[in-house]
Amino acid sequence: MRCTLIVNRRAGRKGGLPVNLGTADDALAALAAHGIAPAVAETARPGHATELARAAALAGDDVVIAAGGDGTVREAAIGLIGSHVPLGVMPLGSVMNVAHMLGIPRDPQEAAAVIAAGACAEIDVGRAGGTRQAYFLEAAGVGIDAALFAYGNAIDAGRWGAVWGALRLALRYRPRRVVLELDGWRVELPALMVSVANGPFCGAGLRVAPEARVDDHRFDVRVFGPMPKAALLRSLARPEGHEGSEGREGREGREGREGREGHEGQIYTFKARDVRIAAPRGPLPGHADACPLGSTPLRFSLLPGALRVLVGSSAALAGEPHTLASAGPQAPSHPTPAQ
């Protein structure tokens, strides 16, 4: 197997403190134990993993492996959109939403075993547009979460004074009216936040869309309406497998527009490929995979099956994976993002 390991040695640090469960050397040793000897390329700046992944794919690699956190994985993935080259993940970050969604264990030996096994799937990628353009694997959206992510990024960088700003914002934030266009269908309603989810998780492991699947060719659009902040937090921190008050019955026809009222507020779930969000009473902040995106109006579009990935047995998939050898040389019908 010809492959490149893209390494971010700064992954797994929150607030300037190391909190990761492995190192790049652990990843290399685990891969070697499974007979995989990759070329190593280290990231030096933001966006560098995208360049390295694209170069590896063009050079003829069979697999590109990202060793780092969710940010490194997302950057490497962007470089492989539209390529037949699959992405493997060696989790070195503090949260690892993408690894969780793809069924990749945190243990380096177990993660390397997933790569060696070669189970492959084509997953969807989200594209967000507004004042900025961005791709996302987890979720995007607008509202209180987008406003708080800016503080979270400052805290991650060690600026602890941002904690107080985040607390003030959380206490003062009020629902705002939003206008959604979902594949052309329009709805207006009040919301604390709107998540356009490709997968179940975003940010610090928040379960923004428990039923979302990364290969079902639909976004799960979750609208969190007026409710106490504690109820919102409980909903986002809900344990895996517990659906809560809206339940499955609000999602029976997954091709359509769905949702129902929860007993502590309103949480609506919709399915759509193309989502536009506007705020008639002034702009709302947006994010893509917890990174600032600008403000409304924003558009989110889906690239179905745009990224080939190596997955574990517990991946959050709607379909079944196939072996890498049977994937074939055909690339998904999406253009590679411009450099």
Short names for language-model regions:
Residues 141, 145, 195-210, 292:
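Glycine-rich phosphate/pyrophosphate-binding beta-alpha loops
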Residues 32-34, 43, 81-193:
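Catalytic core of DAGKc-family lipid kinases
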Residues 182, 213, 223-339:
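ATP/nucleoside-binding phosphotransfer catalytic cores, i.e., glycine-rich phosphate-binding loops
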Residues 174-176, 190-192, 215-219, 271-275:
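A generic structural signal for short beta-strands and their flanking turns/coil linkers
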Residues 154-161, 202-205, 210-231:
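Gly/Ser/Thr-rich active-site loops/lids in small-molecule metabolic enzymes
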